[in-house]
Amino acid sequence: MFILALDSLEDLETIIEARPDAIVLGIEPFCARTRAVTDWNQLPALVRRMHEAGIQVCINLLAMIEQSRLQACTEAFGQLAKMGVDGLYVADDGWLEIAYAYNPETLSLLIVQPETLLCSGEDASFFARQGTQAQSLSHELSEAELIACVKTCPSCELLCAGHYSWMESRRGLLSNYLHQIEKPEDFQEGRLYTLREMNRHGRMPVWQDHLGTHVLSDEVFQAGEYLLPLREAGLQRYRIDCLLMGNTWGLDMLKAYRTLLTEGTDALSPKQKEAISSTIWKSSSLIRKEKSHGTR
């Protein structure tokens, strides 16, 4: 199952023609780390159009649940369940309680995506036992660790292409920093900046919005050819995140990975092989963020 997390809502007909198994988009104010945002008036028609094309619709609900918004989250969950969406990406465990209170059967809508926190098959199995649809694994696991997780919990999901979340903070880190260096006029909410650590060469995309500060990985994650042994281990859900890369890039990734899984590595063009060259680590460690070297 290929899931395409959109970067925008443009060219939806092109996306329909490409036939991903599912798309992911956001709805304010419950989403995070997405630019493909719809509203309550447009969403029902969009769900119907995608369902007519045989494409599932999943909703990004990755913003944290604050007590002041608990009632709004509860009402939004009910609306989405009645609307017939196919999945809800969540990072806050509070959504499990909301789903259980609404109707225990709706726990099957939840796809747990806590970014770097889901590091073992046991973690994933816990959420699977609650009745959730899928559990998105950490992006910093080695090939062997990922295979072990999938064998323990076959309902796991993996980001196979795209930026991943490096850090989230409710604090206004960018605005505070620019104020501290006496350049407050350089701050703009939602503007994309880059951040470079002293011990790393890459530049990490960073922005600040009403939710706080978001930092993404300095490089695009690629599962590459390791998706083949992961599929052999039982992995069935592959997510492509188009954020900052664009929907066209996502469709190129979709085509390449479909070719890889259906026809094998030899069927890939040289350009495709280069584009999806794996960034999965070979050695085992859960602390990639603090390392400036390693063996892939």
Question: Positions of the model-derived regions?
Answer:
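Active-site pocket-lining/capping segments in soluble small-molecule metabolic enzymes
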Residues: M1-E122, S136-R296
